Amino acid sequence: MSKKVPLSPAPFEGYAAPRGRVFNSFLETVGGTPLVALPYLTQREHLNGRLLLKLEFFNPLGSVKDRIGVAMLRDAEARGLITPGRTVLIEPTSGNTGISLAFAAVALGYRLIVTMPENASTERRKMLRLMGADTELTPASRGMAGAIERAEQLNRTLPDAWMPSQFENDANPAVHEATTAQEIWEDTAGKVDMVVAGLGTGGTASGIAHGLKKHRKSIKVYGVEPRESAVLHGDEPGPHGIQGIGPGFEPDTLDLKALDGVFEVSEQEAVATARLCAAVEGIPIGISSGAALFAGMELARKPSNRGKTIVAIVPSFAERYLSTQLFDGLA
């Protein structure tokens, strides 16, 4: 037997530090997601700005929507709108909000029905069912408008039903103003210059904009919508493959006046950028994350943004999209 070589301590250094606490509930683990630099992508793409990713898939159920899933139910309970064991929750969603509501509903004692477009990924539908949620699929051609219409029908007919209504609920942007924006501010030591986020409900971008501009009005916040359904640019809504953004209408939770612009990113650009991030940085991100990163790279390439800190919000992990075009040809 060959002589064992003593292990070096180096491989075990640099891991995340312990937080010194035991969480009383899975709900308490939402938020506090990391900001990560992209050294290899920066070098490969000759970026001038300092581009960071805020990895929201570090939330307990793997997406940015965990923040609003918990916030909307906690807010409704505090206002006496829902009661555990009696109220039936109904929500239209392309998947991630439903998954986040499902884990919060289980933890707090509610039944959940999710209506969603039929082109939502198989992984999302199975996750919902795993946590006991009922799902109803609506035509893909109707987009989120069709899912909303069906949810409203159920809300009118079922007794003791309540819709969190992520596209209208003020707790949606409010939780991002109170948490996501403050995390970005603190983790960059107040040196953030720009933030890019996909626009689904618009709550993430709007809340971050309100929160950060309280600290410094010069901070720029940009949204991203699919080029194939660029409603905010005056185009007609249309089918697209960037799940989670581009609902086909302007939601109440979107405050366009708080934003400094909206990028159009195509499905092809979003997928290619998500794959690039995985291949170059080893960070497998979802399709809408690829869209946000594409826009972030566009900003970081500009000579005028040399040395500026740009944050792109990564809503979810690639593994939630195994059955989508993100993984086409990779088997």
Locate the predicted segments by residue.
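PLP-dependent amino-acid enzyme catalytic core
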Residues: 1-331
